[in-house]
Amino acid sequence: MPWITSLRQICTVTFDGTFDRIFDIGIPFDFPSGCAKIIGSYNGLLCLADIERITTSGNVIYLWNPNIRKFKRLPKPCLGQLDSVTLGFAYHSKYYDYTVVRISISHSMPPSEIEVYTLSSDSWRRIEMLLRSNIKFYDNNYFLPIPLVSGALHWMAGFIEEEEKHCSEMIVCFYVNCEKFRNLEMPDGSMTVPSFQICLASFKGKLAVITYRESEHYYQYTIWVMREYGVNESSHKLFVLPFGRRVAICIGFTENGSLLICGRNDQLENKKYKFVLVDTETLLEKDSDIQHASCVGTFMESLALLDGANMVSY
């Protein structure tokens, strides 16, 4: 499992189950902002993008296989410079291809602009979302990659009802093989309690909805998991992770279902936050040696990205 520090462009690879450090890798390319975010990782390829301030601009994107020491910078998106976008990275199982989806996030009214990059064509093209026009995409995942589950990328979005000026939460899916959008309902019960933050993740290959709630006395994460994909009735509350008065940020899940969190620890002198791996079955915590706020993705070695234009070996 690789993670990237926000202070130094270094990728650290750790064991998935224990988070014990294996080795560090210097990232062989630069970003204008000096900070990188892991957009996703599949079949040995990491997709990284630049971060400007607190938003992902997605104007500089790289595909990188550290195992074979090759990378390529993606061509400029056809939509050009955008203030804020959300990015998804996926493996195209039908054509053995890789896809990057770039969606503009508008702070006013939708619709959003959408474009798709494929590695085989090495080009971007615009696509239309044939759903309701008044859907507004959110970028609530922050450290978490946009989850790829059952061949689809998943975003939190809002359906703006014009007459009532009310925004209803929903999940929007992009199916990579057919390039079609559809929407999923939120799990029953997940919206009954007001939440400070809602994000999506892949938990052991299943779609998970994570709600973060804070009150005067405690902070907690509640994780809902869809046991049968596309069947809302199969969603169930898997567990609740209470953190007392400790502020915690969900960084990501490991392949075996452990949760990596970043929590404020005022007792530490040299760092404001500490990173903890939580066993979601026993709720036991294990400290990690991650020192700074990071983006995390799962990783498995491969020989992908051997061919193609604008490939750089180092």
Features from the language model and the residues they span:
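N-terminal entry/capping and adjacent linker segments that precede and initiate structured domains
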Residues: 1-314
